[in-house]
Amino acid sequence: APGEHVYGLGDKTGGLDRRGQSFVDWNSDAYGFGASTDPIYKSIPFFIASGEGGGAYGVLLDNTWRSWFDFGHRAADRIEMGAEHGPIDYYVIAGPGVGDVTRRYADLTGHAPLPPRWALGYQQSRYSYMSEEEVRSIAARLRAERIPTDVIWLDIDYQDRNRPFTVNTQTFPHFAAMVHDLDTLGIKAVAIVDLHVADAPGQGYAPYDSGTAGDHFLRRADGSTYVGIVWPGRAVFPEFTDAGARRWWGTLFAPFVHDGVAGFWNDMNEPAIFDDPAKTMPADVRHRIASDDFAPRTATHAEIHNVYGMLNTRATYDGLRALAPDERAFVMTRASYAGGQRYAATWTGDNSATWDHLRLAVAQTLNLGLSGFAYTGTDVGGFAGGPPPDLMTRWFEYSAFLPVFRDHSAKGTPRAEPWLDGPEQLAIRRHYVEARYRLMPFLYGLAEANARTGDPLARPLIYDFPGTDVHDCDTTMSFTLGGRLLIAGAPRPEQRNSYDACLPTGTWYDYWTGAAVTPQPSVSGPFGTLTLTPRLDLLPVFVRAGTILPRAPLVQSTSQRPDGPLELDVYPGPDCRGEIYDDDGHSMGFARGMFLRQQVTCAADASGVARVTLAPREGHFAPWWNAIRLTIHGGVDYTARIGGKAVAERDGGFTFADQPQGAVIELDRR
């Protein structure tokens, strides 16, 4: 239709709206990809179309062969799609809204599991930290600089000759002790484990030996084992379409789980191959399909290619759950397919240190969220090249409000740790990391809601404000967290001239000051505009009126117990509500009722807030807080009572004992 806009397809480049473009699905290693490179790492053949009236529908083309989509590129009024081979098997998902489609798509393809809380913290990485000494030094510097951090990532150079499931004992002589010592600092270790097993007969390399004995490696049409060149040199590849091979793969993680490694990173799983002109396996490589969910048969790589990376993460995830059944598994993947969110978080791959890539990062993250992958991030600052200081700082600011926050850079590029551009840049970056940690109760609540509903954490404006994609306002760098926090950056993040920030119609509050803002009504759409002048130290963030936002005192790690009350910030407005959610952050106990959920509402009229109500608590988890601090924004002074007893006001807020049975806080204007 003329006013239709198209979203989804995972990590495709080209901006948020797919209208007028065409794409190919074929998982591809795309180092340093450009703003219009296609295909890249993932194949998620699902799109959502949204019309002028805010109505929406979705289509999933469940075909794993090389496929294509045309959204008005050849013919302006037509959507076309197809594939080289395979079934014409597609699902049409009704709305009426974008959110309805997204949730039903998650119901169809599977919900992402609730991640460990530490996966929402700040994460430091480099290709590569070359030694145990360097890892310890990075951890010590992060703590000395007071940069809240939850993860340090280990890229391939921790391994012996780039062989998966090994450790270079020359450079990492005390690997298990290092992992333990990081944990005492509140920092988890996440280690890369690629799927290419070194072709090393007779060398005592256990993954090769056990995989060969179990007949777990792919073969060519003539029956010979397929060998490709990747990081270890000659390598063989697991038969992830075989349930037995997946179980075997999962057992290989046991020593690392025993050593305390908290998560694993499946890279290069498009799969990427160095010595093939197509940069992947030949199409005639054979895959044995032997799994409870499919009839047994043999398929060619041309059919399996787009799901191979997802099956790799399935094997990893299932293996970790089997090794530690009461712990949540964390897997990061580069390649995947529709439904891969059941097994892994993802990132947008080997991006570049440019302002255009920062713009692209927001669109890719939002479209991945609409495609099921709620846990998505980008390499902060860009993987390829070196970011100028201002770009790195701005990237930190945006990433503080995106689901996965990882600073990662390539070998041979300038170092990109947050302190490297001097104290002024570091202070800004630290401030935004701290802001994220203060928001952790809110972020973690969004994560829990995603596991239940499929609602993404980071959302385009159309998700919660239908019709906002039909307007003249440039919202390229705008998105929301849970429909409650609106990040409204300049359309070109490097610009220094003023711009009109577009806020959906209604009342909003400045997150940084708590003050209500009054946008100018727009004649072109359901927006008001605020004219803002960019500042390097300020990313504009607004809170939707009617929000009750849970926050926490600052910590240096999510494993640290916050010192002080839970904070509830009330931003008066219609349908005023919020939710408090908590659990232990790492185990499966929440599935057995070991969680806490409490609804919070407020009643307001023209004169202000009359009361805040905490409903009786659900679940059986004792939280870290024993008190609550309530702050009412909007510039009105109040007195407060609970059960007729006055609550003292201090520094603009009211602190009272935790209320697991529920309570009503009565408020009167002074």
Across the structure, where does each feature detected by a protein language model lie?
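Catalytic and substrate-binding clefts that recognize carbohydrates or anionic sugar/phosphate headgroups
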Residues: 1-116, 126-127, 132, 139-144, ...
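Glycine-rich, histidine-containing beta strand-loop boundary motifs that form or position
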Residues: 11, 48-50, 60-63, 71-72, ...
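Short alpha-helical segments and helix-capping/turn motifs at coil-helix boundaries
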Residues: 26-34, 39-45, 49, 106, ...
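A residue-level signal for conserved active-site and pocket-lining positions in enzyme catalytic cores
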Residues: 46, 105, 142, 182, ...
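Active-site mouth loops of central-metabolism enzymes
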Residues: 122-133, 236-245
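Aromatic- and carboxylate-enriched substrate-binding clefts and catalytic-loop regions
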Residues: 148-429, 464-466, 475, 481, ...
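Catalytic core of carbohydrate-active enzymes
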Residues: 317-331, 335-347, 360-364, 368-378, ...
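Surface-exposed interaction regions enriched in Ser/Thr/Asp/Glu
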Residues: 660-670
